[in-house]
Amino acid sequence: MTTTIFEPGGFRYMPAVSQYSGGVAAQPGLRIERARFSRVVPLAEGFERIAQHLASLGRPNSAFCACELRSPAPFTEEGFRAFNAIYITTLERWGLMQGGVNPVARSNVCPDIDPPAQPGFHAFSYTVVDAAAAPYFIVAGSAESPEGKGDYRDNAIAFGDVSPAGLRRKAQFVLAEMERRMQALGFDWSSTTATQVYSVHDIHPFLADELVRRGAMRHGLSWHYNRPPIQHLEYEMDCRGVSTEIVLPG
């Protein structure tokens, strides 16, 4: 899998589906920073806050390269498509979409307890100029269903099976997808600074064998008691390698 350079933003990306890319990496002379809101900020307000933050750094909106969303509950397939259509309108207005191809990486998950009232931003990432920067990257979220093959439900790994064996199969698929995306960007687990898991199920039975032994937890693990964004999916991950992370007021 090859990557494509998005010159206006100073990053390259792994093409995936219309709603997001498979991952991004900073171009030479730039680095990726991650900013997390102290609480979820609703989508429209969040885009405004992101634009203000980028402007304060002297960066264009096109420097926006990744985000982590939170939604009230898992979507139906049709509901997910409708949400994505709303989400990408701002990306189109910002000049981020290239012929229908989306360069921005994204995770979108649903807190099972105390969810937000509406979809919004948990965190976002962007490029900044840094002549001495080491390579930095972000891999988009993936659940246990291949992208671009029709309905997620119809292609889900071990559909409906939340037994230890079923969850292990789901995790194996997602971990392999993380590795495939990192490899396309020129990275591996040794390059990560953070790994995140989103599931409401017990991951301990396969944690050591599937995550620790392959190096996915070299800096520990952030486990969010969240569900993937589509109904009937059970396990999602993303990962990143960045040097600067900040927290902004919600």
What positions do the PLM features span?
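Beta-strand segments within the central parallel beta-sheet cores of soluble alpha/beta enzyme folds
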Residues: S190-Y198
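Extended repeat-based interaction scaffolds and adjacent low-complexity, acidic/S/T/P-biased segments
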Residues: T2-F6, Y13-Y20, R34, S38-V40, ...
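Intrinsically disordered, low-complexity acidic/Q/S/K-rich activation/interaction tracts characteristic
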Residues: M1, S18-A25, R39-A44, I50-R59
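Short glycine/threonine-rich loop-to-helix capping motif typified by GTGT followed
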Residues: P74-F83, Y198-R213
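Short, well-ordered alpha-helical segments
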Residues: G46-L54, G58-S62, C67-S71, T76-I86, ...
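C-terminal edge-of-domain segments
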Residues: T90, S107-A132, R218-G250
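Hydrophobic alpha-helical segments and helix pairs
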Residues: P72-P115
